[in-house]
Amino acid sequence: MEKKVEFLWLEGRETETLSLPAYETEGAAGMDVAACLDADCTIEPGDIVLIPTGFALAIPTGYEIQVRPRSGLAIKHGLTVVNAPGTIDADYRGEVGVGLINLGRQAVTIHHGDRIAQLVLAPVLQARWTVVTELEATERGAGGFGHTGV
């Protein structure tokens, strides 16, 4: 199933050599997104950097776009999306940026056009809170954080 998302390259950015976010395989859930940089960006271990993409989106109402790490960058270099998954709300119209953190032991340099994250379009359900005096009992109860073993 496809859903239309409006895409705008931002003026004054080096976007001519960039491609639209794209699914790399037929069964892919995420679209790879590239960095839009004026100069290389080196991320030292422990550092967090906001990488621009050079575009803005209009996401349909009732949807979000999740910003997720690329597995190869995470496994090979320790580079991941700092707030994974990040959320781009349907009413946001600014430039999409990707917050990356280097959890590895060596510096990682990002170049213009490098694929830095994945974008996943997902439906959104909004909650309606109901205040109650008691919750329905379950077998699990209040057990959490390791209650089923390691």
Swiss-Prot record:
Function: This enzyme is involved in nucleotide metabolism: it produces dUMP, the immediate precursor of thymidine nucleotides and it decreases the intracellular concentration of dUTP so that uracil cannot be incorporated into DNA.
A single BP term in Gene Ontology: dUTP catabolic process
Cofactor list: Mg(2+)
Catalytic activity, EC: 3.6.1.23
Organism: Desulfotalea psychrophila (strain LSv54 / DSM 12343)
InterPro entries tied to this protein: dUTPase (IPR008181), dUTPase-like (IPR029054), dUTPase-like_sf (IPR036157), dUTPase_trimeric (IPR033704)
Classification of source organism: Bacteria, Pseudomonadati, Thermodesulfobacteriota, Desulfobulbia, Desulfobulbales
The protein's name in its UniProt record: Deoxyuridine 5'-triphosphate nucleotidohydrolase
The entry's keywords: Hydrolase, Magnesium, Metal-binding, Nucleotide metabolism
Short name of any one Pfam family annotated for the protein: dUTPase
Pathway entry: Pyrimidine metabolism; dUMP biosynthesis; dUMP from dCTP (dUTP route): step 2/2
Family of this protein: Belongs to the dUTPase family.
HAMAP family: dUTPase_bact (MF_00116)
Catalytic activity line of the entry: dUTP + H2O = dUMP + diphosphate + H(+)
GO molecular function: dUTP diphosphatase activity; magnesium ion binding
Highest taxon listed in the record's lineage: Bacteria
Enzyme class (EC, first level): hydrolase
Residues given in the record as substrate binding sites: R70, S71, G72, N83, T87, I88, D89
